[in-house]
Amino acid sequence: MTKNISRRDFIGSIAAATAATALTSCSTISTPRRPAGLRATQNAKVQIGCIGVGWQGGANLDAFLGISDCRVLAIADVDASHLNDAVNKVNARYQDKGCAAYKDFRELITRADLDAVCISTPDHWHSIPAIAAANAGKDIFCEKPLSHTLNEGIAMVEAVQRNGRIWQTGSWQRSQNFFRWAAELVQNGYLGKVTRVEVGLPSGHADFGGTGNTKPNGEPPAGVDYDFWIGPAQMMPFNPCRFHKNWRWNYNTGGGQLMDWIGHHCDIAHWGLASPQFGCGPDDAVGPSEVSATAEFPAKDAVWNTATKFHIECKYPNAVNVVIAGGYGEIKGGTKWIGPQGWVHVDRGHIAASNPEWIKEIQAQEKSGNLKIRLYKSPGHAQEFVDSVKSRKRTLTPVEVAHRSQTPGHLGYIASVVGRTLKWNAAKQQIIGDAEATKLLSKTMRAPWHL
């Protein structure tokens, strides 16, 4: 780890800034402000630093490199091979050698010439860089799920609101036509009052890293600062099966299929429910009042120990029931809203409705401008973030929305662990009358890391 910035001093400054304001309800929205000295203007290129440039981080880097009105100035990654490859890619794109390389993300965040950061680290490394970036006056693009624990998400929302930052989550489905059309169908009342939503997620474990789950512990690859990679998670021996890409299958660093996908399909479910007619609350405050769940888990000490199958039932206000399931064939992958007048189902590359003519009507009305409730049509997920950094307008997936979208996943996991139904106060963001479950809203971070 780099020595020119004190880890303890840096973290202390984050903690002091975070403690300056008590945590607030995520339903409180503040208008993003432009602090004095922010470099970006309507005519300037937005200058970005990328933290984490592995699998998804590499894809996000490519997206920003393809945008003419932004410039990637710096890369941070604890894996030297990822870092070097990304820096070379940036320099080749701009045909110069201007991209700075850092192992320590804290050095990147302190740069005064950066307007924004893109955080594409594993789940356990979202909250600390995000809060630090917000406190440093940076706007933030961050991967989903928003946070490794629910309480980390609350702290992230508070930091972004207090500092008036623009935030975009990597829940890119909101920037796609099929998902927008489906949510518009629901919000425009084609189904009547929605009574049930089915959210189908993948199950099991996908071997994205190509390692399988039976390799023995060993030494980390050359050029990897494994202590820094583990960071606030609990120290575990290095094992290639729970490293790049496959870290998501161990609860120390990820949240399994449930949390890997909750920020996609449950996010879309909430988007459809965000109309006042359903009584579930606005998009940035919607949430369940009761959650019950069952799940199948490998052994706790297994290399991959996240749930392989899960079924979560959530009661929302105004008699709306939301089912989130993985491994149950009757719950089709994607998002399906059901009401007395019919249903609509959407997944990647697919939209269907009980009345196919509805889809044609929505498309025609959207085109003509006659749609009563018209949702924002994104120019592209990364482009919209860049545009919002300049305009200071909220994005499609601000931090408040991301937090509410992931909440049923966190609560569903907790309910499956304690084995009982949870009562949830969505306004106060507290579990009611269950001390054991409440403890699972957060994790102890490995010293010296803390929020």
Place the predicted regions along the sequence by residue.
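Core domains of carbohydrate- and sulfate-ester-processing enzymes
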Residues: 198-242, 442
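Rossmann-like dinucleotide-binding domain that binds NAD(P)(H)
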Residues: 219, 227-317
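Beta-strand-loop-alpha-helix segment that lines the small-molecule cofactor/substrate pocket
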Residues: 122-123, 127-175, 189, 419
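C-terminal helical cap and adjacent loop that interface with cofactors, partners, or active-site loops
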Residues: 13-17, 33-35, 59, 237-240, ...
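N-terminal Rossmann-like dinucleotide-binding module
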Residues: 17-94, 173-176, 269
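A structured beta-alpha segment of the ubiquitous adenosine-cofactor-binding alpha/beta core
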Residues: 94, 98-119
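N-terminal secretory signal peptides and thylakoid transit peptides that target proteins
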Residues: 1-18
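Basic phosphate/pyrophosphate-binding loop/patch that engages nucleotide-derived ligands
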Residues: 159-164, 181-194, 217-220
